[in-house]
Amino acid sequence: GTLNLGMGKQKGDAIAPSGKTVTITSRKMDADPVLITKLFERGKHKIGYLMYTNFTKTFNTSIVKAFNEFKEAGITDLVLDLRYNHGGDDDASTFLCSAIVPKEKAVVGTLLSKETWNSPCQKIFESDPQYENLLNRFFVETNCNLDLPSQKVYILTSGETVSASEYTIACLKAFMDVELVGTKTYGKYVTM
């Protein structure tokens, strides 16, 4: 929408109308969650650094661009900064995992994760004919799998590492070596 604001000037303890009006129009803005990408070299290691602030599948193309640049540079190691990532879309998390887990393990269509709920909820899910798709996540095609030689990822964490970030950490731990650097995550998932 549009909003017209009447401007004023401070006169003592009050604000007096200046007669000027400013019109502002709202606009939806989506910030790219790939906030920073950098390359570092330490000895024989070429390190790709990615600060990722929110899991938003509309920006998977930003992951593709960053990871293809990392691949072109020949990175040996990845530092994934999730310190200020409050989570987001599970599909974006699945995409990111599919791009990081080594190729021989990240086979498109194979199981990435399986959710298990308490007994009453689990029974409700399992009564749905599509429950496999409700509780399970599968590797997807990314066209940017890093296939890191070390099969290890370093993840920077903080108390603001929440939800889909923690889910991503848990999924990556199941398929490769993950070294957490930082403080305890928020604790919505079991990766604390």
For each of these PLM feature ranges, what is it?
Residues 149-158, 166-170:
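A conserved active-site cap/scaffold subdomain adjacent to cofactor or substrate pockets
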Residues 1-78, 84-86, 91-92, 98-105:
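Flexible, low-complexity junctional segments that flank or bridge functional domains
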Residues 102-109, 173-182:
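Bacterial peptidoglycan biogenesis and beta-lactam-recognition machinery
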Residues 8, 51-55, 81-85, 111-115, ...:
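Active-site-proximal beta-strand/loop segments in catalytic clefts of secreted hydrolases
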Residues 188-192:
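Short, charged, surface-exposed secondary-structure boundary motifs
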Residues 65-72, 99, 139-144, 170-173:
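Mature extracellular/periplasmic domains of secretome proteins
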Residues 31, 45, 56, 144, ...:
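Residue-level recognition of alpha-helix boundary/capping or hinge positions
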Residues 32-34, 90-152:
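Gly/Ser/Thr-rich loop/hinge elements
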